[in-house]
């Protein structure tokens, strides 16, 4: 039987993208604090528990079974596999201006470990760092009033690294790249599809004053004159 499980913790840390477009901390702290509190109040990390890891495990099994059968003989089946997420951490959020100065990018960094067991292979633990990038775009209506619109939302894997203090066996070396690629695709596609709608809802319900502050930041950055 497939074994799928998740374990979550919160970590106050720092993992932000390096960019010359960073908003000054004294300006962005109020906004990132509100967003972080919204994520916690909305049990954002627990939403990962609903992500279908069984689909990821089946994908990995489909892709590595043939090669493992050649290397170690026919021995792999669904009942011989286990996958689980461990030690998921929400790190320090950050804001930056979009490159065209017409919006704001919210960066939500996550860290997690993926435990994977494929029958006789030694258990693997892969350390993952990924950023969720949420783009807020400045738009104006027919009356010239500005608003923030939820733009593109994506997960960008920063690193997928095997945690192992011992030399890897030949079978593990042979399939490691395939496993890492499958995990990267899962993060980009499935994880993003599961988490981005929640982020859209969170941003849509931000305090009006915070939204106005963001709009003013973008307008100032773009040197747009606004008559109130």
Swiss-Prot record:
GO MF entry, a single one: lipid binding
Designated name of the protein: Latherin
Entry's localization field: Secreted
Main subcellular location of this protein, as a coarse class: secreted
Function: Major protein in sweat, has surfactant properties. Has a role in temperature regulation by having a capacity to make hydrophobic surfaces wettable and so can function in promoting spreading and evaporation of sweat.
Key words of the record: Allergen, Disulfide bond, Glycoprotein, Secreted, Signal
Tissues and organs where the protein is expressed, per its UniProt entry: Found in sweat (at protein level).
Record-linked InterPro entries: Bactericidal_perm-incr_a/b_dom, BPI_fold-superfamily_member, Lipid-bd_serum_glycop_N
Quaternary structure and interacting proteins, as annotated: Monomer.
Modified how: No sign of N-X-[ST] acceptor site even though reported as N-glycosylated.
Family affiliation: Belongs to the BPI/LBP/Plunc superfamily. Plunc family.
Disulfide bond entries: 153-196
An individual GO BP term: surfactant homeostasis
Protein's organism: Equus caballus
